[in-house]
Design a protein with these regions (language model features):
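Short, conserved, GDST-rich strand-edge loop motifs in beta-rich repeat architectures
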Residues: 36-56, 171-182
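Beta-rich catalytic cores
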Residues: 20-22, 54, 89, 107, ...
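C-terminal substrate/ligand-recognition segments
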Residues: 215-231
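Surface-exposed loop and turn segments in beta-propeller and other repeat-based domains
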Residues: 64-88, 123-152, 192-219
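Beta-propeller blade signature
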Residues: 1-9, 51-65, 119, 181-191
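Residue-level detector of Asp-centered blade-edge/turn motifs that repeat once per structural unit
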Residues: 26-30, 96-98, 164-166, 230-231
Length: 231
């Protein structure tokens, strides 16, 4: 982890993370940084199948004192997911006002909640699946978009995530291994689904001519990240 002084554009500190980081979030009160250590799988090994150790984890950085004095705590995420539980591949992290981090485990199709103060997993659950109807799953030549097929039990496999309140967060369901649901979902912290956009993103892209038929037999629009704001 490299710490940079923005005003002077100089590096002021480094902290060894002991693995391959993917994303980072800083708590609103400035007490913690949460760094996802994905230890990403090698897609050229065994066809990209997992498990491929070492397992991923979450690193909590305690932002106490000068950056050179910051310390790291590691939170194990193994044994949580029903899919490939020995090899969690955390992807993205977001922190709410109570300093609870939500972490996506994309290839595991799982979500974990971590209390940054205690460094403990306070909850976790599967991201679940959806059945997509009136979807185009065919790569035609010449390009032709036809929303007339069904894709049953498609794993969401979320990538980006953001809190939308203290008790709800939204995920961008890109898919990376066997899933991807072409949209986004709003979850409650108990794992229940408050809202799922279904095929609406795909239809809106088609209406404005931004549908690439070559992607229809794969993961469609592949939403990778999500942000939240009030206007």
């Amino acid at each position: 982890l490299v710490v940079v002084h923005i005003a002077t554009r100089t590096k002021v500190a480094e902290l060894d993370l002991g693995g391959q980081p993917d994303s980072v979030a800083v708590s609103k009160d400035g007490r913690y940084a949460a760094v996802v250590i994905e230890n990403e799988r090698d897609e050229s090994v065994n066809g990209g199948a997992i498990p491929q150790l070492p397992a991923g984890r979450l690193a909590i950085i305690d932002l106490v004192g000068a950056p050179a004095a910051w310390t790291r705590r590691d939170v194990a995420l193994t044994g949580l997911a029903a899919l490939y539980g020995t090899d969690p591949e955390p992807e993205y992290v977001s922190i709410n006002e109570d300093n609870i981090a939500v972490v996506t485990l994309q290839e595991n199709n799982h979500l974990a909640l971590v209390d940054l103060a205690t460094g403990k997993v306070s909850g976790h659950f599967s991201a679940g699946s959806v059945t997509l109807t009136d979807v185009d799953l065919t790569d035609e030549r010449p390009n032709l978009v036809q929303f007339n097929q069904t894709q049953a039990d498609r794993l969401r496999e979320p990538d980006g995530v953001t809190w939308v309140s203290k008790t709800r967060f939204a995920t961008a369901n890109e898919g990376d291994l066997n899933g991807g649901s072409r949209g986004f979902t709003v979850f409650n912290t108990d794992g229940s689904v408050a809202f799922d956009v279904g095929m609406d993103l795909e239809y809106r892209l088609a209406r404005i001519g931004h549908t690439n038929d070559r992607r229809n037999d794969a993961k469609g629009n592949e939403p990778e990240n999500v942000a939240f704001g009030r206007f």
